[in-house]
Amino acid sequence: METLKSENKKRVLPSWMTAPVDEKRELSVKTPKRKKIAAGQVGLATRAPVMKTVYCMNEAEMVDVALGILIEGRKQEEPTLVAPDKPQPSPPYSASPHTSSPGSSSEKEDSGNRWPALGLSPSHGPEAADSPCSRSPEEEEEDALKYVREIFFS
């Protein structure tokens, strides 16, 4: 029973737990690390930050931008198709599809309905839109979707 008493027990501690710690040496080891970290942060602060621009668009915005680009491209191609002696002024396009808000799709739809009429001769004018020779809205939509498919899936 004598072995169970705490007076008789001696614990043996590992050497790293019993060795006296030199506080000066421990501080000198930590100090250079802190200086390196601080120097690294100063170096980061002196360099110009790298700016990356990320554009995020949903599918509807991508289609709007693509259609706007196609419409602009078609407007640029049509003056070359028209005879040089009869230049037709293109209708003003107030908003760029790149800067317009998603809520302004009515302007894009209006301009989309105008571009097929640009190829008509001056004698036809806007009244020709109601004639049986004009394209149906389904054909116009299919034509626009054809360009979108061509851009995104080829």
Curated annotation (Swiss-Prot):
GO annotations of cellular component type: cytoplasm; nucleus; site of double-strand break
Record remark: domains: The KBM (Ku-binding motif) mediates interaction with XRCC5/Ku80 and XRCC6/Ku70 and recruitment to DNA damage sites.
Protein name: Cell cycle regulator of non-homologous end joining
Pfam families in the record: MRI (PF15325)
Assembly, per entry: Interacts (via KBM motif) with XRCC5/Ku80 and XRCC6/Ku70 heterodimer. Interacts (via XLF motif) with TRIM28/KAP1, ATM, MRE11, NBN and RAD50. Interacts with splicing factor SF3B1. Interacts with ERCC6L2; this interaction is DNA independent.
InterPro entries assigned to the protein according to its UniProt record, in alphabetical order: MRI (IPR028278)
Motif (XLM): 144-154
Compartments where located: Cytoplasm; Nucleus; Chromosome
Protein's job: Cell-cycle-specific regulator of classical non-homologous end joining (NHEJ) of DNA double-strand break (DSB) repair, which can act both as an activator or inhibitor of NHEJ, depending on the cell cycle phase. Acts as a regulator of DNA repair pathway choice by specifically inhibiting classical NHEJ during the S and G2 phases, thereby promoting error-free repair by homologous recombination during cell cycle phases when sister chromatids are present.
Biological process terms in GO annotation: double-strand break repair via nonhomologous end joining; immunoglobulin V(D)J recombination; negative regulation of double-strand break repair via nonhomologous end joining
Segments for region (Disordered): 77-144
UniProtKB keywords: Acetylation, Chromosome, Cytoplasm, DNA damage, DNA repair, Nucleus
Principal location: cytoplasm
Motif KBM: positions: 1-21
Modified residues (N-acetylmethionine): M1
Sequence ranges of Low complexity compositional bias: 95-105
Acetylation in keyword set: yes
